[in-house]
Amino acid sequence: MNVIDQLEREQMRMDIPAFRPGDTIKVHLRIIEGEKERIQVFQGAVLRLRKGGVDSTFTVRKVSDGVGVERVFPMHSPFIERIEVVAQGKVRRSRLYYLRALRGKAARIKTRTAWD
């Protein structure tokens, strides 16, 4: 086993739940401002997953006050307190960039049921 592979394996988090594009998740972030520390929650739909070991990222989109906000999170970041899966979405694409152009009810994602 390579030394680099061993270091990457040590830095990977094992407490991340399984989620896919289309799922609605809550990302609890640890924000450090000066000497204060607080938790900020970012809830939205997963647009994409990029798997690459320690370098894995995922993009979450939410609409805040009528403005679309997208944020890219490193999967194994120490600033992520936890990730909660709120709802599982039923989509047929792995990249949901088409949601950027949709507004209102058209931007909704169907929920996945147990037999889907």
Swiss-Prot record:
User: Which InterPro entries does the entry mention?
Assistant: Ribosomal_bL19 (IPR001857), Ribosomal_bL19_sf (IPR038657), Translation_prot_SH3-like_sf (IPR008991)
BP GO annotations = translation
Domain of life per record: Bacteria
One Gene Ontology term, aspect cellular component = cytosolic large ribosomal subunit
- Annotated Gene Ontology MF terms? structural constituent of ribosome
**Keywords on record:** Ribonucleoprotein, Ribosomal protein
UniProt KW ATP-binding keyword: no
Q: Return the Pfam families for the record.
A: Ribosomal_L19 (PF01245)
Instruction: Cite the NCBIfam families for this sequence.
Output: rplS_bact (TIGR01024)
According to its UniProt entry, the function of this protein is described as: This protein is located at the 30S-50S ribosomal subunit interface and may play a role in the structure and function of the aminoacyl-tRNA binding site.
Hey, which family's this protein in? Belongs to the bacterial ribosomal protein bL19 family.
Record's protein name: Large ribosomal subunit protein bL19
